[in-house]
Amino acid sequence: KIEPDSAFGRHPPEVLPSPDEAADFYLYAVEHLEHHGYRQYEISNFAKPGYEGRHNLIYWDCGDYLGLGPAAHSCMGGRRFYYPADTEAFLNDKAAPVMDGGCGAEDYLILQLRLRKGLDLAAYKARYGKEFSTAQLAFVKNCVKSGYATFDGSTLALTPAGLIVQNSILAELL
């Protein structure tokens, strides 16, 4: 979706690629970048080995992080919260943090499948006590057959083609 108030929305191109063309462009970009030594480590991030953006990995792994200031988001001890964006209220100590839940099993699954390393099912079970159902495993098998995922029995990872349709895959797994 193109947001109407964004620069792109205010000055849209005359022609946009079709969804199929956009997918082809994405797959070409993945191949081109990997050919030049940039490894895709997350749905929209590439880096040379050892130069991955570590700061984002804490979010994808549902780790603890502390944000300070107006509009800052934090996750501590599995509980997420944020401060309202009102700077005046924050400075006057009138901005109470707003709780918005924690990083539960669904969040973890969604965030781990953003990463090319994928979801370690043993870690998922250890952390949340959840295992994939027979129906979910059958769906995973179909994703592998279709070239959307790899699954070695312990780790489920989406391929570049799978990352394109990640939302549809997640809808089936959740």
Question: Across the structure, where does each feature detected by a protein language model lie?
Answer:
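C-terminal scaffold of the Radical SAM
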Residues: 1-130
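Short, amphipathic alpha-helical interaction segments positioned at domain boundaries
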Residues: 161-174
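A short, conserved structural fragment
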Residues: 144-154
